[in-house]
Amino acid sequence: MHNRPEFPKRAVVTAGMPYGNKGLHFGHIAGVFVPADVYARFLRDRIGAGNVLFVSGTDCFGSPINEGYRKLVEAGDFDGTIADYVQMNHDAQKAALDAYDISLDIFEGSGIGLSGVKQQEMTDAFITRLYDNGWLEKLSTPQFYDAQAGTFLNGRQVIGRCPVQGCKSEKAYADECDLGHQYDPVDLIAPKSAITGQTPEMREVSNWYFELPRFHDLIAAHIEQVAGMCGTRRVLVDEVESFLAPPIIYIQEKFADDFSAIEAELPPHSVLPAEKGKSSFGVEFASIAERERAVEVMHAHGLRFRTGKTLVPFRLTGNIEWGVKAPDLDGTLPDATVWCWPESLWAPIAFSQAALEESGRDATDWRAWWCSDDARVYQFIGQDNIYFYGVAQTALWQGTQTGHEPHVDGTGDELRQTTLVPNYHILFMGKKASSSGAIKPPMAAELLDHYTPEQLRAHWISLGLGVKPASFSPKVLDPNANEKAPDPVLKESALLANIFNRI
């Protein structure tokens, strides 16, 4: 006989954080919010509505917002502040979520409402704890600078090609591509400024970094435990394990002679022959620092290469003025702000605090939801974000533990590892669509001109995105649709209506 499922006494359900540079497209709703909403409703039925917090909010900061705001202002289409711009998009996002009957306990933002206040407090405490525990280092690294515009460039203000071996992303930005791969800015291939279209310079900038490579063994131990748990999705395990590979540089075999000519200048390494069917051999190093020294040598000699996935220091701060203010840890970076990705990882804690306080409970009780063995946090995410939640967040949570060497999971009043629920891509007409890509997704509000929320919710849940990518192909938006063919979007709701009519 199978064991009956066990449920926590309290549960938090999170549904990611859409950037505050636009309304919600169908992928936001179908890929994350609807699955999270279904599970939150299920948990309320199992353990009681008062024991479930379903939280989310607008990601108010980051280069996509700066870029979107800049373009609108330059085009003369917006004359408010950047805060006004974010609030406008937040309001549109909330309206769409309400229209789809997403039953959130709170939807504010990392810079909006009480959640924004809590987020600044949480950011100060979180980063200070990591610093006090000895897990931060200040690094001076090259950053893109647009001399024509007279400004440093971050994130999506730079566009190029991903340097990670085998990556098939459509676009790559300053230090990450649209498939979530992380790399050093200097490795980005063919960078161009999104502001002027010019090739940017590289200038040294100091920032705080979390020493992610030091947590390799703890991350590996955690994902091994997760892999053995019932319900774990294979895409989570595969993606996390791919980042645990050693530091490797890949070089096409046609450049083997050029490599041999400079090999003596490289730090200690091992040469790995090209795998069957591959055109590149590998050069493996013992540490990320040694690989970076090798990268400098190869750049100096003009040798072409690509880097493999591995753990690299995780940047916490930046120099974008519009951002959550970073604590001034040693008096040297008083104007630093926090990169949007790390602060978005602990933002759901701030949302939980705000939700508790706004419902008449005590915000300080958040630890009973995030730091307790009888509670669990379920985080619904897209597969492109597994690196941030499954790799970086795992280690950040471990890095906040105090009084002992870090453990795989927290004890006492320490943060517990969360349960990640990643979904595969939801395609549009069989192709990947994104707001920044060639194929634009339909907006969530637009679809309600053709379907009811119930019809869309039933269809999206039926796609099984936890198992495989699936296509959303609404007949009303398909120019090649057969007039006589049924609309695939209506199949599930028609079936349910037929069943209910027979009862």
Please provide the spans of the model-predicted regions.
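Cys/His-rich short segments
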Residues: 133-214
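A glycine-rich helix N-cap at a beta->alpha junction
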Residues: 88-105
